[in-house]
């Protein structure tokens, strides 16, 4: 159909198409491009200690684990929200709202120690993010990788580097869609 959007304070005439997409993901599987997420790495001998000093939740202690952590204001309000993935010892990967990148990045840089114990690097433009979500997402992704994606091997809130076809991606078993799914973080060149 060739649809011309009609502005309205009610449901737009695009509603049926959006509804169809949402239902398909909820009942089957869908692929979403979330490359607009902001991304940075936090590395160095004091990476874990520093992150624990700037977010309210405890950052992941084990390699391969993911935590949802919030940076709070002095009054206890939420200043920022980060998905924090522990890639390796002293190496963390932070994912946060693309619309807040400038704001959140500013706070991270201002709070970073100047003694060289922590390096905070913006890597948003280096990595893309594809979200594969829905009840059939495991089946689709399993057909593209030799990594066992079963619950025992790939737990909720965990991540690992996997082969996807002929490429590699960091697969994070987390998403905010409310269905089974993975975020596939990959080099833009992939």
Annotate each language-model stretch with its function:
Residues 1-190:
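Glycine/proline-enriched, intrinsically flexible loops and inter-domain linkers
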